[in-house]
Amino acid sequence: MTGRALAAHLATLALALAAPPRAAAAEPPAAGEPSLATPPRLKELVPAELPPGTSFPSPEVTVILSLEVGASGRVERASVESGTGEPFDGAALAAARRFEFEPGRLASGEAVPVTVTFRMRIREPAPAAPPPFRLAGRLLERGSREPLAGVAVVARSEGQVLARATTDAEGRFAVEVRTSSFTLAAAPEGHQRLEALVKGEPGETREENFYLESLGGPNETVVSATPLLREVMKQVLTAEQVAVMPGSSGDALQAVLNLPGAARAPFGSGLLILRGSAPGDSRVFLEGQEIPQLYHFGGIRSTFAPTFLESIEFVPGNFSVDYGRAQGGIIDVRVRDPSPLGFHGEADVNLYDVAVEMEGGLGGGWSLGGAFRRSWIDTFLRAVIPKDAHLSFTTAPRFYDFQFIATWRPDPSQRLRLMFYGSMDRVVALLEEPEADPTITGTFDALVSFYNLQADYLSALSSKLRQDTSLVLGLQEVDTGLGPQYFFDLKLRRLAARTSWTLELSPVLQGRAGIDAEVYGADVSLNLPNAAGPNPVPPSTLPQIGTTQYVVLYYPAAFAELRIAPFPSLSFLPGVRVDWYSDIRRWAVDPRLLMRWQVGPTTVLKAGIGLYQQPPEPQESAAVIGTPDLLPERSLQVSAGVLQTLAPGVTLEVTPFYKALDRQVIPNANANYDPSQPRYTNLGTGKIYGVETLLKVNLGDRFSGWLAYTFQRSFRTDPPSPQMPFDFDQPNNLTVLGTYQLGRGWSIGARYRLISGNPDTPVLSSIYDSATGVYVPVYGATNSERLGTFWALDIRVDKVWTFKDWKLTLYLDTQNVTNHKNQEDWLYNYDYSQRTELTGLPILPILGIKGDW
């Protein structure tokens, strides 16, 4: 039951006396006077209601009451004869006043008032159970893949049955258990007996297939430390973990950046830097379709609200052939369907933004949900900007995003999902004359937005064949300008389609193939400084480059993959992906191979090798401002790892990796002086290597956390320059975080980060440019220095109150609680003779309140 006091509803009450309630002591009736023949009998037991979070002095509290039961059977007076104190005495009295009795009666049958004594026992409630682990599986015959219907499936632990289920006509079943480890057993007639140890996490939902051989004789038992076949191996971040994760403000896409392989982006820029790759080398997908913008301005919030996120697949390298046009890593966001049962919602108000979400079922297999979020950081940002800053806001940074989702499930084998989602960021500022370049004045205006209409259809065409199809129509706009001379305007229309077929030929062999196509139509208008070197110089000293054009780009691709499992514990995934890039008129063929070996009950080995290519950036291959005959950029990626279970709830994963880069696009400085020279070339190379370590600890329902450490080096060679550290080379990246459930609705979490500073190029001197009246910096060796080490401590505290029909949460998520000044860059004076550290965000507390029902 739920209600105002969960503890009170769970408390047990009992009559103190073994006999029925007795009348209070009195003189024996005189001769001829009527005597009590039947004492009062309790008709309805009303539980005592205690305030939430009541502390019990002992496991059981006893209150002895004196009750006067009237002739009507109602309690007319109640008092405490022997109590424990408040709030127990008051709760017992309040409950007793609502008791109903069969009244006491004389021998004549007349109802009369009677005083009785009751002893009420109130027991301390047991702690709330963790969310269940849900396993949805199928029992199939090995070889023929025929479903095994009508089979009883049992989940048990230490001899106790936790759940039962029966397979349907397709061999499907589902069990929910509140333990992280259990044995799944089934004994289909004429087949192997299944007995497999299953391990999961609270709140996790998993789908698995189990293959059992047909037998000519009596049943035999197959005992395995893991299920006979696992379809997917992945890290799981449950919604409960993300909601209270310190430093992430409940944002799942922020939380995933605490994993190894993800570098820290400077200035909260929201850049995605995975395994030493450039920010533009990695891609983010939503159900297989790319999201143009991952984070809002400032990098604190992602552009897709976490309300409808089901899971996030974070792959910093060696991803499958499903994905292409990227030589870094990928993040694929999986969306949950709106709840088809009842009406639910959530409202979240904090110092940074406000969000609201609603969802519910419509009947006929339809469910609908929507969410909207809008920042109001602009309302108090002006108060924290120094008065001597060369910047004043006309429109302070603001954003909004929205998501509307409709799902139709006509039967278990089909699902249609329609989504309309988008995001908008806007800022307008007045920039006064900076010392470094007084010509850069006027209004700075930036608007970035995107809107996607997406349809996903999933169909099980048969027990062996499945099809996934996705179609998206999108619009992206970028409108930026600085004063009257510089601007960049882009309106990008996108049509993308993806479909794949998965065919399970046998337990040993599975095939997967698909197509992935994108078409872009872009209106581009720009006038910008033509910077051709790696280091910034005053824009007024550079020539300007401008163009206005309409460009059509199309990127069709096809991919195929086999899953070969010669043994249940060993599987290989060879695959190939073929892409066509219309802007450079080039083919790209990417062979890839992944391997997974379950060495023992607690050890898994994984390895991968593959080729990954991506087209140049549009401005690099454009006819007017770029070089159209470039080659695709390319990387060879190799990684190998081990996943070891050290103890129940404790796992260690170590993954060394290496990436060799070639055909990297670099600017050609000679093009500024010789127009016949190409603006860009494919002469860039690079290498990236390192080790990722992830130690995860989940100790029961109280504590969860991890230690993520990445050692990594990333180098680039841009001829004629020698090899140099990459701009985002961070040799050491340590993140330690954990959350502890204190009880009674309280939880506390902390995150500590220690990260190497990014490389930096020093300014040695400057030269005065009389034509523009500014000083031009003279740089030293590129990336020969390094900025200061970054470290920060974040703390989050949550308090949850649970009511009858809804929950209220108060939280404080504070980033950089020590207010440590972390260096993000150097700030130079007008002639570059002096410099001071440019530091990042100070302490950032986000206080919020959230209600959900």
Stretches found by the model and what they are:
Residues 350-374, 391-427, 445-467, 505-510:
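Transmembrane beta-barrel wall of Gram-negative outer-membrane proteins
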Residues 25-162, 168-174, 181, 195-196, ...:
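Charge-biased low-complexity segments
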Residues 494-500, 546-551, 631, 649-708, ...:
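Outer membrane beta-barrel strand-and-loop segments of large Gram-negative receptors
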Residues 168, 190-192, 198-209, 220-320, ...:
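Periplasmic N-terminal accessory/gating domains of Gram-negative outer-membrane beta-barrel systems
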Residues 421, 492, 502-512, 516-518, ...:
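Structural signature of Gram-negative outer-membrane beta-barrels, strongest in the C-terminal barrel
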Residues 426, 523-538, 584, 597, ...:
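Surface-exposed extracellular loop regions of Gram-negative outer-membrane beta-barrel proteins
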Residues 571, 658-660, 681-764:
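Gram-negative outer-membrane beta-barrel transporters
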Residues 753-774, 788-792, 798-853:
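C-terminal beta-signal and adjacent terminal beta-strands/loops
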